[in-house]
Curated annotation (Swiss-Prot):
GO terms for cellular component: cytosol. It holds the Pfam family RrnaAD. This is Ribosomal RNA small subunit methyltransferase A. Its main location: cytoplasm. Keywords: Cytoplasm, Methyltransferase, RNA-binding, rRNA processing, S-adenosyl-L-methionine, Transferase. SUPFAM superfamilies: S-adenosyl-L-methionine-dependent methyltransferases. It comes from Halothermothrix orenii (strain H 168 / OCM 544 / DSM 9562). Specifically dimethylates two adjacent adenosines (A1518 and A1519) in the loop of a conserved hairpin near the 3'-end of 16S rRNA in the 30S particle. May play a critical role in biogenesis of 30S subunits. The keyword Cytoplasm applies. InterPro entries: KsgA/Erm, rRNA_Ade_diMease-like_C, rRNA_Ade_Mease_Trfase_CS, rRNA_Ade_methylase_Trfase_N, rRNA_adenine_dimethylase, SAM-dependent_MTases_sf.
């Protein structure tokens, strides 16, 4: 494909040629601004040794710039019509594999092992449909695969929540979950006018750099994330009330009071004020105390 895809003319030409009807249920919004494409590519800092996972390539607006700059590219597209379009448009690139699969169903360890890929050399790029943003990102981060980095276009409000600092209005369970696994940066705000069709909201380009080693050591991740959800379930409650009255996790008031005191926290503090490190320590302290009551020996990190 010689013509630039990420322009109004290039995009409409492909839509007409293949008689494409955009699928609202799949959140299909195609990029038509080459400057935005370049910002994504530049943020990813691609080189010809990189292995790239592209999620939701659509008609190839981003793919067109990824392929010449990467060693191998795996593009996951759920819409079978667009899989055919992509394979025709990029049939000259042997290092590109277009995979017609829902990315939420991918077993990443099996995928990498079957292709002899080292996860540390993999970058993830995507213009993510809004409706699958959180499950896709959390699925990648929770996969125990250490991706090199992720550069993603997401809804602005979601980006703000992912990057939010403790005590801010956007700080919540999603902030903690994403930042638990990696560093988050917001690079650019993107208007609706750079898409066909136009979404109703602004987007942001974010970069997530997963931690190569755990930064926050928690004894039991399942318990930790239940505690986090409980903390943010009713933001206006004190930390103690959140942990003793939530439907997520109901802890003994005495244990919670004792743990808060041991951590040197104000007993009236709201959970939304805690840093992730403080939450990790609190989680380990509570887990230890619960285990003591159960007669088990659980080490605190």
């Amino acid at each position: 494909m010689d013509k630039v895809i990420a322009t109004p003319g290039g995009t409409n030409e492909i839509i007409r040629k293949y008689n494409l009807k955009l699928h609202k249920g799949l959140g299909q919004n195609f990029l038509i601004d080459q400057n935005i494409v370049d910002k994504i590519i530049n943020t990813a800092d691609l080189n010809n040794e990189d292995i790239v996972i592209e999620i939701g390539p659509g008609i190839g607006s981003l793919t067109q710039k990824i392929v010449p700059r990467s060693g191998r590219v795996f593009a996951f597209e759920k819409d079978k019509r667009l899989v055919k379009v992509l394979r025709e448009l990029f049939n000259g690139y042997n290092h590109l594999e277009v995979i017609g699969q829902d990315v939420l169903e991918v077993d990443w360890k099996h995928f990498f092992d079957s292709r002899g890929i080292s996860d540390r050399s993999v970058k993830v790029l995507a213009n993510l449909p809004y409706y699958i943003t959180t499950p896709v990102i959390m699925g990648l981060l929770e996969s125990n695969i250490t991706f090199s980095l992720m550069v993603l276009m997401v809804q602005k409000e979601v980006a703000d929540r992912m990057a939010a600092a403790p005590g801010s209005k956007d700080y919540g369970a999603l902030s903690v979950a994403v930042q638990y696994y990696g560093e988050v940066e917001i690079f650019h705000k993107v208007p609706p006018t750079v898409f066909i069709p136009r979404p109703r909201v602004y987007s942001s380009i974010i970069k997530i750099k997963p931690h190569s080693e755990p930064v926050y050591r928690v004894k039991n991740e399942g318990f930790f994330f239940k505690m986090v959800r409980a903390i943010f379930q009713q933001r206006r409650k004190t930390l103690k009330n959140s942990l003793t009255k939530s439907s997520e996790i109901k802890l003994d008031k005495g244990i919670v009071t004792e743990a808060i005191r041991e951590l040197g926290l104000d007993p009236r503090i709201r959970g939304e004020k805690l840093t992730i490190k403080q939450m990790a320590i609190l989680s380990n302290t509570l887990w230890y105390k619960i285990s003591e009551e159960d007669g088990e020996n659980h080490e605190i990190y």
